């Protein structure tokens, strides 16, 4: 039987990558559960755009750090949608600050958001998919820092490394149930979290990236939409890097730095 996804949940879809992903999945014919943490107006705007595409949208507040509430929100959205075929774990953020300045509370705050919340969310989604007996797609939005470090972001980097490992282990265990699990690892993307709007991508020059600009949210969303589609049926446990070639510049870029400014968290 060909996988025909009709119902998706995208966490943190009030703006940026999450919003673009919700719209891309709606364009692919899916009804979408839209979630927000602090920007209800943004989530309602995303939902309205989904509806303009002729698809159903359900909006719910979602706090990935409130681990007891996470399963209930996902189950509620799935029930309202009539089931769950695609789950996109997009909620995340934070840096944690320089390593020597961190305390355990700061560490737990970032790891709790990016890894604990992701585990509970994806576990809930996978359980719903497995119990339905139907195929499913789980996609985690990670980061290029899931494989490479970043000064001033020890907790963030550790949490994203952990999330990449979780994705790969889930892929091993869930494949026989018809559930694929993949990650999409963005580089610098023109989103509000980076103090940019999508239109800033074309007007911002990044000489250290082979494609010398930030990415657009839609360029991440298009890859997520592929992984959520029937066309990705034999793809699982993979990390899809969408970074304009940033990760290819390691030694060459490092050898051309002309100051020690990179050593500061700023």
Task: Name these PLM-found stretches.
Residues 98-99, 106-111, 205:
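Substrate-binding pocket helix/loop in short-chain dehydrogenase/reductase
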Residues 83, 88, 175, 180, ...:
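Short, small/polar-rich loop/turn modules that mediate ligand/substrate recognition or access, typified
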Residues 143:
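Residue(s) in the substrate-gating loop at a strand-loop-helix junction
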Residues 176, 183, 191, 203-235, ...:
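C-terminal helical subdomain
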Residues 14-16:
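Conserved glycine-rich cofactor-binding loop
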Residues 122, 159, 167:
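Active-site helix of classical SDR
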Residues 127, 172-173, 233:
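Alpha-helical segment proximal to the catalytic Tyr-Lys
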């Amino acid at each position: 039987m060909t996988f025909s996804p009709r119902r998706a949940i995208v966490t943190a879809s009030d703006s940026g990558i999450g919003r673009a992903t919700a719209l891309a999945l709606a364009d692919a014919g899916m009804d979408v559960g839209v979630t927000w943490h602090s920007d209800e107006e943004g989530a309602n705007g995303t939902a309205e755009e989904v509806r303009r595409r002729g698809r159903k949208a359900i909006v719910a507040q979602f706090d990935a750090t409130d681990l007891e509430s996470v399963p209930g929100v996902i189950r509620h959205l799935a029930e309202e949608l009539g089931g769950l075929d695609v789950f996109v774990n997009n909620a995340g953020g934070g840096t944690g600050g320089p390593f020597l300045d961190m305390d355990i509370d700061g560490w737990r705050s970032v790891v709790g958001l990016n890894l604990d919340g992701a585990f509970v969310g994806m576990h809930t989604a996978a359980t719903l998919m497995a119990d339905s007996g139907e195929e499913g797609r789980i996609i985690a939005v990670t980061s290029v820092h899931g494989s490479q470090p970043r000064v001033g972001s020890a907790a963030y980097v550790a949490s994203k490394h952990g999330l990449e490992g979780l994705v790969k282990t889930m892929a091993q265990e869930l494949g026989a149930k018809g559930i694929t699990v993949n990650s999409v690892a963005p580089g610098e993307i023109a989103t509000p979290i980076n103090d940019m709007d999508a239109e800033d991508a074309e007007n911002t020059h990044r000489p250290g990236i082979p494609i010398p600009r930030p990415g657009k949210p839609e360029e991440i969303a298009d890859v997520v939409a592929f992984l959520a589609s029937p066309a990705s049926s034999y793809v699982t446990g993979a990390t899809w890097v969408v970074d304009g070639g940033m990760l290819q510049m390691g030694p060459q870029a490092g050898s051309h730095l002309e100051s020690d400014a990179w050593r500061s968290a700023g």
